[in-house]
């Protein structure tokens, strides 16, 4: 059974990302585009568009041409959009890199992507230099903040503008090359075209009949990293395409984050569940005026029903969630959020315009009906071309009919709303029964004395695997308390069988639980 979008199809313009976002923006446009969170300095849309054209000119003067790759290895900064769009306007491809990567990890990505130039910051410059030498092929390193031994990024923006970029085919020419472990393990370059990104922005626009869209009256807080596809497309590019204001923070620190919402009157917030957890439970939240917040959208990891409701009630604003992957540019589903209660908490909502969904039995491959759980398959114009230099991994993930096999387990209810249960490869097999860690985590987070939690498989000689909870406690709590709390609320095979108290849960910069770290620890003890 194929589940279509409830929204009418939208027309996807055959244009490049930079043209779609900025169009014919003139330097006389004084509307504020970017606000530097730490300093309060502002950049207008006119200034931003001019800087992008000059950055493109600076790159072109260095021989950067259509199809060439620029790496960005940096935390969030107001200069990030200039680097991204400067390269894009010049016809290039941008590979975004996690600034927490080691020199070896950075070198591996630069080498695989075939990068010619690299942009970084003082905080990352030593690793950048080491990686560039190891990778080979890097002709010049630029730094946003004039790090010693690099070319100042301003050298690209001080010269003449590139009057016109090269002729591009939006459907086949790449513009972004983020890296993802995907559904098959191992970091791989995700080939995203101009059309992929433009399509996803237009799809987000086209879901406004049920969802609260962005306008030039909105102020968005960019605390999630731009190197991640969620930050790059949804926070940075979609917001700029709608002429909203973006307050840019380099990292998440709770008090700085709350202060930015208060000081800049943030109206629309994109976060991940760990940030919502702090907003729901941390007492310091009450010290800030967050009344400007109108809508909060959560992504990158499943948001439990109880947590979403707790934040909504505490802050008196709409909390919803979306769903997607790096491989889908990223958004495929979004919960309607024009009013509270419009979308059931825990649901990712319906699919975006032009997007189809299937739920498929993981064993038989049969298409499933409403309420039946299986692997989520997606088809739409936001789906990637494939993985760079990895035809094997591409074939495992993208079938000949254009369906992307996500590796996520979920279901569609009778109203066409989607729910994500867990990752296929993260399911726990207890005596042959499947147990979804995310379901148990959402339940455990509703406990008043559990600050954070991760559930993983733990080897067991009798059951094969049992669910084990790693718990960050907030107050007096015993292992028996944790197990009994869950036992009364789930089927027997889903009970937590082991508990370990820890100081923190390992997570990626995007807020996803690093289960493999905990699983490897468990397997090492077996």
What are these regions (language model features)?
Residues 42-46, 175-202:
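Conserved AMP-binding A3 loop
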Residues 263-271, 280-343, 356:
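Gly/Ser/Thr-rich phosphate-binding loop
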Residues 101, 108, 118-120, 269, ...:
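AMP-binding/adenylate-forming catalytic core of the ANL superfamily
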Residues 14, 30, 160-179, 185-186, ...:
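Conserved pre-ATP/AMP-binding loop-to-beta segment of ANL
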Residues 198-219, 227-267, 282:
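Conserved AMP-binding/adenylation subdomain of ANL enzymes
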Residues 5, 41, 126-171, 186:
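ANL superfamily adenylate-forming
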Residues 49-57, 190-212, 223, 276-277, ...:
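Conserved structural elements of the adenylate-forming
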Residues 30-77, 81-85, 102-107:
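Conserved AMP-binding/adenylate-forming core of the ANL superfamily
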């Amino acid at each position: 059974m194929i589940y279509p979008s409830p929204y009418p199809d939208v027309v996807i313009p055959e244009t490049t990302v930079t043209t779609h976002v900025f169009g014919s923006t003139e330097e006389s446009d004084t509307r504020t585009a970017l606000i530097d969170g730490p300093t309060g300095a502002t950049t207008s849309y006119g200034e931003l568009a001019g800087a992008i054209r000059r950055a493109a000119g600076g790159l072109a003067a260095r021989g950067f041409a259509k199809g060439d790759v620029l790496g960005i290895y940096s935390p969030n900064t107001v200069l990030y959009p200039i680097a991204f769009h400067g390269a894009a306007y010049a016809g290039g491809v941008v590979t975004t890199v996690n600034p927490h990567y080691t020199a070896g990890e950075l070198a591996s990505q630069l080498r695989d992507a075939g990068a010619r130039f690299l942009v970084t910051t003082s905080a990352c410059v030593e690793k950048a230099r080491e990686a560039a030498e190891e990778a080979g092929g890097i002709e010049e390193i630029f730094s946003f903040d004039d790090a010693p031994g690099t070319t100042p990024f301003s050298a690209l923006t001080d010269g003449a503008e590139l009057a016109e970029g090269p002729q591009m085919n939006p459907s086949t020419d790449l513009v972004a090359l983020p890296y993802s472990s995907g559904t098959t393990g191992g970091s791989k370059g995700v080939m995203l075209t101009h059309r992929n990104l433009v399509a996803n922005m237009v799809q987000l626009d086209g879901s406004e009949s049920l969802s609260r869209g962005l306008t030039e009256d909105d102020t968005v807080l960019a605390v999630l990293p731009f190197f991640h596809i969620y930050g790059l497309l949804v926070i940075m590019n979609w917001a700029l395409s709608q002429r909203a204001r973006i307050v840019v923070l380099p990292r998440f620190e709770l008090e700085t984050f709350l202060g930015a919402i208060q000081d800049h009157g943030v109206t629309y917030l994109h976060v991940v569940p760990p940030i919502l957890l702090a907003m729901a439970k941390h007492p310091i939240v009450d010290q800030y005026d967050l009344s400007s917040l109108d809508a909060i959208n959560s992504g990158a990891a499943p948001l439990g029903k109880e947590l979403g409701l707790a934040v909504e009630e505490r802050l008196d604003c709409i909390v919803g969630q979306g769903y997607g992957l790096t491989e889908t540019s990223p958004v495929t589903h979004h919960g309607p959020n024009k009013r509270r209660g419009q979308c059931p908490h825990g649901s990712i909502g319906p699919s975006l315009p032009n997007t189809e969904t299937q739920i498929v039995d993981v064993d038989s491959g049969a298409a499933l009906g409403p309420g039946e759980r299986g692997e989520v398959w997606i088809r739409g114009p936001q789906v990637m071309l494939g993985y760079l230099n990895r035809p094997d991994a591409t074939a495992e993930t993208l079938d000949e009919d254009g369906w992307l096999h996500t590796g996520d387990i979920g279901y569609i209810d009778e109203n066409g709303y989607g729910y994500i249960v867990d990752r296929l490869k993260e399911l726990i097999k207890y005596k042959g029964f499947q147990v979804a860690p995310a379901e148990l985590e959402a339940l455990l987070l509703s406990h008043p004395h559990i600050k954070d939690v991760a559930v993983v498989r733990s080897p067991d000689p009798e059951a094969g695997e049992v669910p084990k909870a790693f718990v960050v406690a907030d107050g007096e709590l015993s292992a028996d308390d944790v197990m009994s709390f869950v036992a009364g609320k789930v089927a027997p095979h889903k009970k937590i069988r082991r508990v370990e108290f820890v100081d923190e849960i390992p997570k990626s910069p995007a807020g996803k639980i690093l289960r493999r770290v905990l699983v490897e620890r468990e397997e090492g003890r077996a």
